[in-house]
Amino acid sequence: MTNSSTFCPVYRDLEPFTYFFYLVFLIGIIGSCFATWAFIQKNTNHRCVSIYLINLLTADFLLTLALPVKITVDLGVAPWKLRIFHCQVTACLIYINMYLSIIFLAFVSIDRCLQLTYSCKIYRIQEPGFAKMISAVVWLMVLLIMVPNMIIPIKDIKEKPNVGCMEFKSEFGRNWHLLTNFISIAIFFNFSAIILISNCLVIRQLYRNKDNENYPNVKRALISILLVTTGYIICFVPYHIVRIPYTLSQTEVISDCSTRISLFKAKEATLLLAVSNLCFDPILYYHLSKAFRLKITETFASHKESKAQKEKPRSENNA
């Protein structure tokens, strides 16, 4: 290990980020719990988009498990064993969630594209059985890529402050980590292309139908497509712009201390944007899942009715 990597204080001053991660965790866990309740309460009819959204929700729960540990470690109050656990397990869960989210958003976009542009045909990819099978394949693929980072033996290093996860890794662990990063970047670029192409095709089709008498449904569909695209770009694009140079700084291809510190801070800031998909996903469920939308409507409608019934006797008594 070089002197620059030994003495460069890369992994410090993380406390300001932790407050934002904590806010994301609070909003995200409330939204995810409500989404779970809504999907359980309402029959989703096992439509493809519902299957993909349920898988997306499952991935979000992995993130809610990981964030409290990351927050504790970044605050500098975690015991040594918890810091090791974070590097081996919970940090990997964050990336498992990220790439599952990217892939399932791509399948949601494909499903919407086929529904709105080729509505007269039913393709194999739109069958619920195929959606379940491809979801299982996606989970298996992502876990096969990421889980070795959890189980490859780590080095036994002396306890010290501001230690980075790469310092725990053996040479084989570092090489696998590097391979994982570039596979992940390839996943991002390929599925980003799918999302953008699918959504552009849908927007073009909807624009052609803008004068149709069914305009309210067209407008709702357009909003949902723009929501997916905008949320995806905000959450995931900045992180992957930073990830390639940050990976090079981890392997000491980039060794300048100030550059490494800047890249690490940029990585943390863009990772914050990436995990904020936890807050964005419940909005996505509302626009894309009829079952979720109906449950929310029923819940607020019943709340208003009960409130009106409570206020009615008061008004009668005052009269």
UniProtKB/Swiss-Prot annotation:
Compartment(s) where it occurs, according to its Swiss-Prot or TrEMBL record: Cell membrane
Record membrane topology: Multi-pass membrane protein
Keywords: Cell membrane, G-protein coupled receptor, Glycoprotein, Membrane, Receptor, Transducer, Transmembrane, Transmembrane helix
Extracellular membrane side: 1-21, 70-89, 154-181, 246-268
A biological-process GO annotation: adenylate cyclase-modulating G protein-coupled receptor signaling pathway
A single GO molecular function term of this UniProt record: G protein-coupled peptide receptor activity
Positions annotated as glycosylated: N3
Highest taxon in the source lineage: Eukaryota
Ranges of the Cytoplasmic topological domain: 43-48, 111-132, 203-224, 290-319
Predominant cellular place of this UniProt entry's protein: membrane
Transmembrane segments: 22-42, 49-69, 90-110, 133-153, 182-202, 225-245, 269-289
Family: Belongs to the G-protein coupled receptor 1 family.
Function: G-protein coupled receptor for Big LEN, a 16-amino acid neuropeptide produced from the precursor protein, proSAAS (encoded by PCSK1N). Acts through a G(i)-alpha-mediated pathway in response to bigLEN. Big LEN-GPR171 system plays an important role in regulating feeding and metabolism. Also plays a role in modulating fear and anxiety-like behaviors in the basolateral amygdala. Big LEN-GPR171 modulates the mu-type opioid receptor signaling and antinociception. Acts as a negative regulator T cell function.
PANTHER family cross-referenced by the UniProt entry: G-PROTEIN COUPLED RECEPTOR 171, P2Y PURINOCEPTOR-RELATED G-PROTEIN COUPLED RECEPTOR
Designated name of the protein: G-protein coupled receptor 171
